[in-house]
């Protein structure tokens, strides 16, 4: 423990002297109030400290004391359904402790509740040899999450005592005789430094798709479990709603939602909506699998930088249990702005647009902690972390450094488009500029598992949208009447794909989520109509005949999105009606 003195305060940056014994990344208590800070630079005996609380009122001469520990999070039962700030202070218990609606400075509240007793069921016996990552037992944390208690990193040996029963997280539950003869007394909780990635046995290639229930994503731009996706877009294009939708309905075991520097109202929406929503995969409340980290725009800037690492460390902990985890960061741009502010105050050489030169490596450090991997220890298990980051480029300009550095790393780009949002087409993901590098592997996975020709269907649907885009310019110049019958039909089919399939209402109880089976049925109907209508044109029918003769069946296709999942057969039989209607047109008109 080292004690120094403040010599300079510059916003969230404090410089202290007499710190020659300290180390970079040590946590400090700054000033008489004991504010939480982290050493980010050492020069001789002077330490530059990033303070995670409001620094107004601090002055030269006040003491700075190091703890000798890096910024760490507590990992154990009690994480799920909780809301923390960027440095893992529990906001609900913080309010009870301080009797204040705002974050009172210098107050320390344990991250995990020390009073709750959790029922621990041991799965191993005394005398058994264990090593890092081995599962010792489970705690039923919520109806849907079985919290697995693992041997902490660096510990191996023989279990000399373990018992099932009710324990708080700081009571000794098991004892291990280590290889050097010493004894390790273990609790239900462990600590881990947030800036250090948790080790795994081996990395695996992501294959299984993350089903989000959002048609434009699952069909054209899928992300795998263990993949990384970016959602850039201008203000009002719907980044937060896309993030919320994925957080609500993704087929994962755990969701970690990091509100990093965005509006407080958005976190309020999450708190209001999530408890009422039912997870379609488990039938339980969505909050029973969710951890929230709130570091809104009115909280100290420095804590934004920590919040992303806090979230990904929690995600790695659940991944090591063998769970699939999705982490949403809204928004990584605000996190990058926090880096820029600290870099400026440290007087570092600026890079593009004032961001630090190491921006790209910091973004890469975050996204590379996502992935599919085999965990350490026994029994053997696989876990995944899917990282989805919103990016808020000023003015929607995706050529700015944060977006460009993000796109170099992630394999999925859901580009939100202001013109689409202005036309009230939501989700406003532009199908011509977005991409997914997992598309082929996901298509092959689905074709093998579901025994469908999904890959060819989405290729055909995208072809219609691309052809529509090239025809739109002609239509704008000389009108739709100048197009051939085939081209007019192409425009009509593309319109159906856009309006009846890609457009989705996040606030409609049925349309908000679409299962893969329903997506396939809806897209198959549109492509069946395309095949039958093109066939009728070849046999001599006119475009107007086809359109007027299929009004009723096309109306049913348009309403398919509002048909509930338990009435899927009503959607599947539409293809028979399409064939019947086109047959009637051929019998009464054409050649």
Curated annotation (Swiss-Prot):
Q: Is rRNA-binding given among the entry's keywords?
A: no
Q: Which Gene3D superfamilies match?
A: 2.40.30.20, 2.40.50.100, Bovine Mitochondrial F1-atpase, Atp Synthase Beta Chain, Chain D, domain 3 (1.10.1140.10), P-loop containing nucleotide triphosphate hydrolases (3.40.50.300)
Extract the GO molecular function terms from the UniProt entry: ATP binding; proton-transporting ATP synthase activity, rotational mechanism; proton-transporting ATPase activity, rotational mechanism
Reaction equation(s) it catalyzes: ATP + H2O + 4 H(+)(in) = ADP + phosphate + 5 H(+)(out)
**What superkingdom heads the lineage?**
Bacteria
Q: Name one GO biological process term.
A: proton motive force-driven plasma membrane ATP synthesis
Q: Name one GO cellular component term.
A: proton-transporting ATP synthase complex
Which positions does UniProt annotate for ATP binding?
233-240
Q: Could you tell me the keywords of this UniProt record? A: ATP synthesis, ATP-binding, Hydrogen ion transport, Ion transport, Nucleotide-binding, Translocase, Transport
**Which stretch is the leader sequence?**
none
**Top class in the EC scheme:** translocase
Q: Cite the EC number.
A: 7.1.2.2
Q: Name one Pfam family in it.
A: ATP-synt_VA_C
According to its UniProt entry, the function of this protein is described as: Produces ATP from ADP in the presence of a proton gradient across the membrane. The V-type alpha chain is a catalytic subunit.
Stated family: Belongs to the ATPase alpha/beta chains family.
Annotated protein name in UniProt? V-type ATP synthase alpha chain
């Amino acid at each position: 423990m080292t004690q120094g003195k403040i010599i300079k305060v510059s916003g969230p940056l404090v410089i202290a002297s007499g710190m020659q014994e300290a180390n970079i990344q040590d946590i400090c208590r700054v000033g008489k109030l004991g504010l939480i800070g982290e050493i980010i630079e050492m020069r001789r005996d002077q330490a530059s400290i990033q303070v995670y609380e409001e620094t107004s009122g601090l002055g030269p001469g006040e003491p700075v004391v190091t703890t000798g520990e890096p910024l760490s999070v507590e990992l154990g039962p009690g994480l799920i359904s909780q809301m923390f700030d960027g440095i893992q202070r529990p906001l609900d218990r913080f309010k009870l402790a301080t009797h204040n609606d705002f974050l009172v400075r210098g107050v320390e509240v344990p991250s995990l509740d020390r009073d709750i007793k959790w029922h621990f069921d041991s799965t191993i016996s005394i005398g058994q040899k264990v090593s890092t990552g081995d599962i010792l037992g489970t705690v039923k944390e919520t109806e849907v999450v079985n919290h697995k208690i693992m041997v902490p990193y660096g510990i191996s040996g023989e279990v000399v005592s373990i018992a099932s029963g009710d324990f708080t997280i700081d009571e000794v539950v098991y004892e291990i005789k280590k290889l050097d003869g010493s004894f390790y007394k273990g609790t239900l909780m462990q600590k881990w430094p947030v800036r250090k990635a948790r080790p795994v046995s081996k990395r695996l290639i992501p294959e299984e798709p993350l089903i989000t229930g959002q048609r434009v994503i699952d069909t054209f731009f899928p992300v795998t479990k263990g993949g990384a996706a970016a959602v850039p877009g201008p203000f009002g294009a719907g980044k937060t709603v896309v993030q919320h939708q994925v957080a609500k309905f993704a087929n994962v075991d755990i969701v970690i939602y990091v509100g990093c520097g965005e509006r407080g109202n958005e976190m309020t929406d999450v708190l209001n909506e999530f408890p009422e929503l039912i997870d379609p995969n488990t039938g339980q409340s969505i909050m029973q699998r969710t951890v929230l980290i709130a570091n809104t725009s009115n909280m100290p800037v420095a804590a934004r930088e920590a919040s992303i690492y806090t979230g990904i460390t929690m995600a790695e902990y659940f991944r090591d249990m063998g769970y699939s985890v999705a982490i949403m960061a809204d928004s990584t741009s605000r996190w990058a702005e926090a880096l820029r502010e600290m870099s400026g105050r440290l007087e570092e050489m600026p890079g593009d647009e004032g961001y630090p030169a190491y921006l790209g490596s910091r973004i890469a450090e975050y996204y590379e902690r996502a992935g599919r991997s085999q965990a350490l220890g026994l029994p053997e298990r696989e876990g995944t972390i899917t990282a989805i980051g919103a990016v808020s480029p000023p003015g929607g300009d995706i050529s700015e450094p944060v977006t460009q550095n993000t796109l170099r790393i992630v394999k999925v780009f859901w580009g939100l488009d202001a013109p689409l949002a202005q036309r009230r087409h939501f989700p406003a993901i532009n199908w011509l500029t977005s991409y997914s590098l997992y598309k082929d592997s996901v298509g092959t996975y689905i074709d093998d598992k579901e025994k469908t020709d999904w890959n060819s269907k989405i290729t055909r649907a995208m072809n219609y949208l691309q052809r529509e885009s090239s025809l739109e310019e002609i239509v704008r110049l000389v009108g739709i009447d100048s197009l051939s019958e085939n081209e007019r039909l192409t425009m009509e089919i593309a319109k159906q794909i856009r309006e009846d399939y890609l457009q989705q209402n996040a606030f409609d109880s049925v349309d908000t989520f679409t299962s893969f089976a329903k997506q396939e049925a809806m897209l198959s109907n549109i492509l069946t109509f395309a095949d039958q209508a093109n066939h009728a044109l070849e046999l001599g029918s006119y475009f107007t005949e086809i359109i007027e003769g299929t009004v009723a069946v096309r109306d049913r296709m348009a309403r398919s999105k509002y048909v509930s999942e338990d009435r899927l057969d009503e959607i599947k039989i539409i293809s028979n009606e399409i064939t019947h209607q086109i047959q009637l047109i051929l019998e009464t008109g054409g050649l």
